[in-house]
Amino acid sequence: MELRGRNVLIVGFERTGEALCRFLLGRGARVRVSDKKPAEAFGTKLDDFAGRGVVFEMGGHRPESFLEADLIVPSPGVPPLAEIRAAREKGVPVLSEIELAYLFLRGRIVAITGSNGK
């Protein structure tokens, strides 16, 4: 999957959003982050990424951002939002972080699960 120049929307910045931002920026994507929490909840974490061109929409979600994206990557803790469903219905691809990572793996994959898939 070519990410260079593509508009990628990350939904939820909390735990894995930073790593995902770095990954996407390293592949030339134009990154936008949408999170329901206000910017103040993240302290200075946003500053470095904003300086690298990441656009932050904090304190709520703009439906337009979902429809304008070339790809949406919701964080694992994000519930199935109406904005994500609407974008998917319009043909915008929605991939989990794991699905996106899989597309860039070059080696063999071994999957091991425990009880009840944990």
Explain the meaning of each model-derived region.
Residues 1-96, 100:
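N-terminal leader/targeting and accessory segments in enzymes
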Residues 97-118:
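Walker A (P-loop) phosphate-binding motif
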